[in-house]
Amino acid sequence: MESLKNNGEKIENFLNQLKNLQSNVDKDFKEFSNSPNTLNAEKDGEFLDKHDEELYNKQIIRSRLEDKISNLSSSMINDIGNDFQTGFQTILYNLPGVGPVFQMIFNIMGNGINLEKFYQEIITQVEQMIKKSLEDYYKNQCNTIFKNLGKACDQHKDLTQKWYDKNGIKSMNHLGKEIPQSTSSTIESDDTLTPMIHASYLDLKIKFNDAITSFTDAKYRGHVAPLLTYTSVMYVAFLRDILKYGKEMKFDDSVLNGSANTPGIKKMLNDFVNVTLSEFLISGREYTNVVNSLQEGYWITYPPPIYKVWVPPQQASWVSPPASELAHKFFLAHSDNYPQGGDLIYIKKDGVYELSPNKITHALEVYYSSGGGYGVNDYPSFRYGGKPIIPLLAPVGNAVFTMLNPNRYKRTFKIRIVHVIVREAKWNLDCYDNQVGEAGSFNQNFVFTSTNIVSDPICGNIGTVGITEIPGPFTTDKKYIRLTCIRKVNFPASKNEGYAVGSRILSVQLIDL
């Protein structure tokens, strides 16, 4: 922890910067809340645009400083933070693909749980394990921040629930059961509700930023990592719902999609997921280092309390794509390709993706396994934080992607591949019931050689990539759908055949038509 102590002055300067930014945002927020023009959508948009730019800059300042003080992680055990990542993934795996997820999250956290008591239980458990009391000032500060966050979440949940009820949008709890609609006798009009939701959005974003900044404070980050986990999950769910329903709630387009000066919720959500996964690695290692240095025993003797609070009583069998695709999942949540209800995708233990019978975009990110092969369900620790896949270098085998079509559901689909291809890539599609080449199997070869250069929504930090669509349409009722990227090693250099060193396959998507 010595490297963190040496940065005390930098941390203090950083917190002062945050304080100044915070006071400016608070001032703008008060002016906005007291303005007689809050019903004006254009006025809302201008203010929200300014607010999001300042808040995003605040997050960027913090993340840059965290990069400077996180070099101690290289000296610690590489996989020690996996329990925090697993907890974060488990929570988000069980989010329903439809309906407002913030309602579900806060129904677990807020309603029925005293947030102050919940916080005290976490701190007490930490202090018992490390046999040391945390400073009262810091404990009280965290308690106040967490309690204020809970109140703001409760207010936002109530306001948005009224809007959902008025617009006939059903909410589900963490077990997939429908939450009864509000019994309130007074349902405000959209003209009344939407400005209140806009103001609540601004207030809650500030509260989330305060909490996340506090829980990643370098001095105590290793002690309060569970609070960072809970807060981050609520924040992701909060942003996801505004992204999904924001247009209908009359949010300005710049808030959702960004503008020249504002990142927008899409980018904020994508960046936050990447930063958070990296942050959990740091927090988890420091947390473990603190516990193991001050008590007898090992990490396994102190499983994070996240498992006692968040995991649903019944294990969900249908889950979303891998955690590093969460941002992409949420982007699709408001598109025509996302299912209107029912199951999503089930990941079998052998790495096969079982496709839902509902219409959906099945996006499979490609991972490089630490075992030396390519697959779609490997989670090497270095993959988190937005790093791109290792280039496909010769000589390697063909890249194979197998998906299970449950109950031989007849489906028609097209294929989209996100990639960086040097030369060309030849693909083979075959659909079968038992063995490749069996009687009645459907085979089709196709080649793509050109790309449209755009920013990739999954791994946006790698620069530009190609997105190639093979329109098909492809139709099958077979049990297995398999895509094979054929790698030719010994082709003549003069022929433009086969992909060369420097190529990357980032994702393979089956899009039901």
Swiss-Prot record:
Record keyword ATP-binding present: no
InterPro entries recorded: Pest_crys_N_sf
GO MF annotation terms: toxin activity
UniProt keyword list: cAMP
Induction: Stimulation by changing levels of cAMP via the cell surface cAMP receptor.
Family the UniProt entry places it in: To D.discoideum protein M3L.
Protein name: cAMP-regulated M3R protein
Gene name of the record: prtB
